[in-house]
UniProtKB/Swiss-Prot annotation:
GO terms for biological process: glucose 6-phosphate metabolic process; glucose metabolic process; glycolytic process; intracellular glucose homeostasis; mannose metabolic process. Its EC number is 2.7.1.1. Monomer. This is Hexokinase. Catalyzes the phosphorylation of hexose, such as D-glucose and D-fructose, to hexose 6-phosphate (D-glucose 6-phosphate and D-fructose 6-phosphate, respectively). Mediates the initial step of glycolysis by catalyzing phosphorylation of D-glucose to D-glucose 6-phosphate. Pathway: Carbohydrate metabolism; hexose metabolism; Carbohydrate degradation; glycolysis; D-glyceraldehyde 3-phosphate and glycerone phosphate from D-glucose: step 1/4. It comes from Emericella nidulans (strain FGSC A4 / ATCC 38163 / CBS 112.46 / NRRL 194 / M139) (Aspergillus nidulans). PROSITE patterns: HEXOKINASE_1, HEXOKINASE_2. It comes from the Eukaryota. InterPro entries: ATPase_NBD, Hexokinase, Hexokinase_BS, Hexokinase_C, Hexokinase_N. The keyword Transferase applies. Residues 210-455 are annotated as: Hexokinase large subdomain. Residues 75-209 are annotated as: Hexokinase small subdomain. The gene is hxkA. One of its GO terms (molecular function) is ATP binding.
Amino acid sequence: MVGVGPKRPPSRKGSMSDVPQNLLEHIKHFEEIFTVDTATLKKIVDHFVNELTKGLSVEGGNIPMNVTWVLGFPDGKETGTFLALDMGGTNLRVCEITLTEEKGGFDIIQSKYRMPEELKTGEAEELWQYIVDCVEQFIQFHHENENLSKLPLGFTFSYPATQDYIDHGVLQRWTKGFDIDGVEGKDVVPPLEKVFKERGLPIKVAALINDTTGTLIASSYTDPAMKIGCIFGTGVNAAYMENAGSIPKLAHMNLPPDMPVAINCEYGAFDNEHIVLPLTKYDHIIDRDSPRPGQQAFEKMTAGLYLGEIFRLALVDILDTQPGLIFKDQDTSQLRIPYLLDSSFPAAIEEDPYENLIETAELVQNMLKIKATRSELELMRRLAELIGTRAARLSACGVAAICKKKNIESCHVGADGSVFTKYPHFKARGAQALREILDWAPSEKDKVTIHAAEDGSGVGAALIAALTLKRVKAGNTAGIRDAQAMLAMC
């Protein structure tokens, strides 16, 4: 028997040698438009810092920089049982979290429910009824025949919301493919609590949070070096602690200047004016055809919701401008379906370990009903790499901007989301971009490192509910609307 030794990573050196010249020209064009060099990254970050600062001002800016009314990090001594409701772009998750006596300890039980596509463009009342259906089902399953009382809820509502209070929030605009009439500009807590009351459920929203804020708090609970929480998933966002004295729009609250206040950046809206982002024609098409043209410019270039669509549009562009160059004499009708491909499609292509791209060929055959040639597979492989690399490098700009704004030289960043956890090479590409932007010497280790976050939308929501009840008990009711109702939950 011959020992073959350790398996080497696949090498694609020279794999373009058999690609025809006219396809190579398209590959070269894609390389030109999707590559973001160091100078461009730095220019983006400088503008990003200015936009973050502007968002904290009284006048505001493109980036909302929403005040969350989470005042400080947990100390690990929080206790109690809390419900957490996580309404993301794909799933609805209901959790029961018990913060134990052990420092930093918790127990969790949870159930996940699919968010039906028809709800995303349906009626507001249908949304709230469905959410409460899921919560009621969860309680009946885990607490059958129990007489429950006083259930504080941390509601992870991962959409831009203005919060004058931690227990209330007005939806600014839908993102992640949602477009439900009658919710934007309205407080989302009363209609939810109304349905809880109608069903006889003793649940009070103790905290309305964003998943990014939850990620920040949950991660710092287990790692005090965590200073930033990020989401790289269906959408993109970050949260961090800002000193109250550096938030002009909070000056009227007369908070101690050094009091930490968690800011939910909502920086998917960065550069909506298209000043610094290197947009391609495909980015413009995505924006034009989206439910919210002119909004979420940064998110549309980096988030998982759009990466597969960028990939699809680039291929359709070749089909339309040079008919017969690719997929000759084949039915390409599947490829022309908008949003048929999500980010898992280019991710799977990048993960194909075989030199002959056999897995990519099978994927294309199964999803698009196209039998691709080896040259076409190489084109798709390179296109997937370019789109994934651009997303990772641009994503690093948001982290770098917060570090520069706060003069953070070294820290841990807690990250979550499907792109971060599942997209191949995303972490390494983002880390490389941070090195370039922040000018670390080649001999220096990475000073700002991105790590897998704790469960922000579950444990984070419970922790923030606990922190809120804790400060109500202590008499600190800043940013709390229903303090008396909250006190009754303690």
